[in-house]
A protein has these predicted regions:
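Short, tryptophan-glycine- and acidic/Ser/Thr-enriched carbohydrate-recognition patches
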Residues: 1-17
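Short carbohydrate-recognition loop motifs
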Residues: 15-33, 86-87, 190-198, 245
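Secretory/extracellular carbohydrate-interaction modules
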Residues: 28-88
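Short tryptophan-centered beta-strand motifs in secreted/extracellular beta-sheet-rich domains
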Residues: 47-49, 108-117, 123-125
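Short, aromatic/His-centered strand-loop micro-motif at the edge of beta-sheets
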Residues: 90-111
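Extracellular beta-strand elements of beta-rich domains used
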Residues: 112, 160-167, 174
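Flexible glycan-contacting loops in extracellular carbohydrate-active proteins
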Residues: 135-161
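Disulfide-rich extracellular domains of secreted proteins
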Residues: 167-276
Length: 276
């Protein structure tokens, strides 16, 4: 399964985010946690994200994986760290095991890719498609990932375009935002948005997109910054092509909602239907 989120501002108010629980493939700040756990493939984990440091001084964790114990013995967690000289490190259980050749510069967005294989015992880090470090002495435990964390409360850097998977992910894969038009739904002036209190009302997104600037689509997600359920319409059914999910709309102060679909080849036939 592939889990994605492109939208940094969702994370600005909640500090360190550790994901657990199982909801859907969107990474969101309102507690929609996920488990990156598949009994067949959870031993080989990959994540990618874009990072920009906003200060000349770092000494910060950025992201990494937690693993299940094996035969009642703890397995070292794997994290990426940028030290006070701005070099990226691989850390196991809070200890530096490899300082990479890569030095981060302020004000530049970098595409970071982390590959952890507990069967092969390898940890590989790429930045902008280039391998910058490989640790080959990670214990071959065969442990499965139980969850992961992005450190998002730092004053010193920003993260966006986060992808986590226990399946296929290439080092040049990233998230791109696209605009769509909306059909089959009326604008509510009083609500300043598209809204309904009736079951079965639809929002249809157009057009179909199969390639974006030469990139092939492998997964897709749709998110709202301001979605709110009601007593009459607590949920929506979201369909994309042949796939669909029922998503419960948030209430109260939490207005983020969305759904993600792995293994899709196009953005097409996207319909949001109000549901009970």
């Amino acid at each position: 399964m592939k889990y994605i989120n492109p939208y940094y501002p969702w994370f600005t108010s909640i500090g360190n985010v550790k994901y657990s629980g199982s909801k859907d493939g969107c990474l969101a700040a309102d507690g929609w946690g996920i488990v990156v756990l598949d009994e067949d493939t959870g031993t080989h984990m990959k994540m990618s994200f874009d990072m920009m440091i906003t200060s000349s001084y770092m000494n910060e964790y950025t992201a990494g994986f937690y693993f299940k114990s094996v035969r009642d013995k703890a397995v070292d967690d794997v994290f990426l760290y940028v030290n006070n000289s701005n070099y990226m490190e691989i850390r196991l259980a809070n200890k530096n095991v490899l300082t990479t050749s890569f030095k981060v510069s302020q004000g530049i967005w970098y595409h970071v890719f982390l590959d952890v294989d507990t069967v092969a015992g390898s940890i590989i880090v790429y930045v902008d498609g280039k391998k910058i470090g490989e640790y080959k002495d990670y214990v071959k435990t065969g442990a499965m990932a139980k969850d992961f964390r992005f450190y998002l409360n730092s004053r010193y850097y920003k993260l966006k375009n986060m992808i986590v998977t226990d399946g296929e992910l290439s080092i040049n894969e990233t998230i791109m935002e696209v605009e769509t038009s909306i059909e089959s739904c009326e604008w509510n002036e009083a609500q300043d948005g598209y809204s309904t209190e009736d079951i079965g009302k639809k929002i249809v997104l157009k057009p179909a997109i199969t390639k974006i600037d030469g990139y092939t689509i492998t997964a897709a997600g749709m998110v709202w910054e301001n979605a709110l359920g009601s007593d009459n319409v607590p949920s929506v059914n979201i369909s994309m092509g042949q796939k669909s999910k029922k998503v419960r709309l948030p209430s109260g102060n939490s207005h983020n909602a969305g759904a993600c679909f792995d293994r899709v080849a196009a953005l097409e036939n996207i319909v949001v239907t109000s549901a009970e």
